Amino acid sequence: SLTLSSSDQTMSDGPFTSANNHPDGQFGHALIKGEDLILEYIQSSSSIDDARLNISTIYHAYKDILGFYNTESERNCGNNVACDEGEYSDQIRSVIFLDMNGYICSAVLINNTSYDLTPYVLTANHCVDSESPGEHNYFTFYFNHQSSSCNNSNSYYNHYRTGSTLRASYYYSDFALLEMDYTPAASFNAYYAGWDKSSSNPQV
């Protein structure tokens, strides 16, 4: 198994096994706070498989995009959704903070007409069109990354899933549809947003 942690042991991710790999063998993980990263690999002495660990990419976030250090900062670029009167309390839980190998975009978890909770994610084509084939495997999907109250309180950064497959995209309408490798955990309390093609007024 593989575990990643910060040098001061205040954050860790894992343990992971080969079962966490994308079908092509690739794997990505969430951001870890700090200047140093510790990788700990443990393998049973009875294992007959050879360990193969290839680190293809390392990136350092030069901005505190997850609020590790400044959790009470004002974000004047938009309204705090926690300050609304509850009209969109469900839809808020569908919004995703999408980390694409050091680039960030917003996205939304959407439902489908089969209502089978396939974890489809809608985002913009311009967010993913520069990615090389296979890089979607490293995408990290953060849920509940918003202030938990109207006074800019802490947001979550431990509600996440990594890995996805690009299912569809179109340049002119600027959309991209991803399918996450894993469904959101029940503890995320994620909401599947959606729409239909009927002429009925939407209900929120």
Features from the language model and the residues they span:
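Serine endopeptidase catalytic core focused on the charge-relay Asp
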Residues: 31-204
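Beta-sandwich interaction modules
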Residues: 8-36, 42-47
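Extended low-complexity, serine/threonine- and proline-enriched intrinsically disordered segments
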Residues: 1-11, 140-142
